[in-house]
Amino acid sequence: MRLSFPRLSSLKLMAAGAAISISAIVIAAPAPDPTSAVGLWEQVDEKSGQPESWFKITEKNGVYQGNIVKIYFKPGEDENWVCDKCEGDERGKPVLGLALIKGMKRNGTAYEEGTIMDPRDGAVYRALMKLSPDGQKLEVRGYLGISLFGRSQTWNRLPDSALAPTPPPTRGPAPKGPPQKK
């Protein structure tokens, strides 16, 4: 006895293959870890309560870094700010896009052994980060020597969708130095 199967057109076969592939990708894609600092964060001025900048924290091979992805400039400040007091490869580069947080290693909800740079003066500080239990706040602490001698900020998590892809701005060469009032 010979079994016969209906013949499927090549278009139907391709559609079926694509559907299977897409469902496999969706099933295999890891769910975001709500206890991870990876994501988009808003830095808020402690005095005014106004947002100052956004950082995108990423992880590669167990090491976390934070790049500045948005800066809220005050009226009259130079929007083409470059880090002229930074050391090494960062010197003279636009602050927007720089990795200001580097070398963080995760230890539960804490991130340790990293550094944070102040782009206004190029100073590099040791740093710690601690994620809140609900994953919506990130305490970022920069310090000299021991953690006791430092300063902390609390950043607020933003949805990753808040950072819509936009084409890079087309501007002339960026002037050097921190933002200056005009």
Please identify what each model-predicted range represents.
Residues 146-148, 156-165:
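Extended, aromatic/histidine-rich regions of cofactor-dependent oxidoreductases associated
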